Amino acid sequence: VFASGIVGAMAYTFSDTFWYSAVEGEVYAMSSFFTAVVFWAILKWEEQADSPHSLRWLILIAYLIGVSIGVHLLNLLAIPAIVYVYYFKKYPKTTTKGFIISGVLSVVLLAVILFGIIPGIVSLAGNFEVFFINSIGLPFNSGTIIFFVLLIAAIVFGLWWSRKKGKAVLNASVLAFLFLVIGYSTFFILIIRSNANTPINENAPKDAVALRAYLGREQYGST
């Protein structure tokens, strides 16, 4: 195992892909770092899977994936590998059916994060913002604040209820979602920076509505 790990690490170290990413002024070096750290974390979980505290590694992975979204969406492609490591550890007697189901579930999880959580949170916050400002007449950012208060309340209730009912999988899922959102919250820096009226303020994502357009890359138009 160590020999194969050393061979893989050395092959990547001296590969053209790695050095090209390392010397260019782009996001791919940091993206490679997060991909490596996330996969390292799932291997640490695999070592301690039978430990009562092994869940913390999965929660760490959720947080790192959330943070990595702010670097590059390419990091989400590590999710299928993570799911397969989980499958092979939890189900030693693997089958073709189980392998296929795990692959499908990994794609579904990837789609939920990519097309659901990432745009969904900002879109809902934007809808709340428009409603509470235009329909009710509250000050700017009121809708966004109310949305996140409700989101936090829903997460707290989910954690409390799942713990009370002894639903360990649901509790872990809600906890993973919480840490994914915490990691994803790095995008708030765009709003903070834009409201500071910096000299370079492309597309001015000053609120949830503008951030939604920014994340949707609407500034590039359609081809």
Range-by-range predicted roles:
Residues 25, 29-40, 58-61, 77-80:
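Alpha-helical transmembrane segments of multi-pass membrane proteins
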Residues 1-14, 33, 49-56:
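Transmembrane-helix signature of polytopic, membrane-embedded enzymes
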Residues 53-55, 92-104, 136-146, 163-178:
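Membrane-interfacial entry segments at the cytosolic side of transmembrane helices
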Residues 40-44, 83-87, 110-120, 151-165:
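Alpha-helical transmembrane segments
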Residues 34, 73-86, 150-151:
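Transmembrane-embedded, aromatic-rich helix segments that form part
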Residues 38-57, 86-95:
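Membrane-interface transmembrane helices that cradle and orient dolichyl/undecaprenyl
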Residues 172-223:
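Aromatic-rich transmembrane-lumenal/periplasmic boundary elements in polytopic membrane proteins
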Residues 9-32, 65-73, 115-140:
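Aromatic- and kink-enriched transmembrane "portal" helix at the membrane-lumen/periplasm boundary
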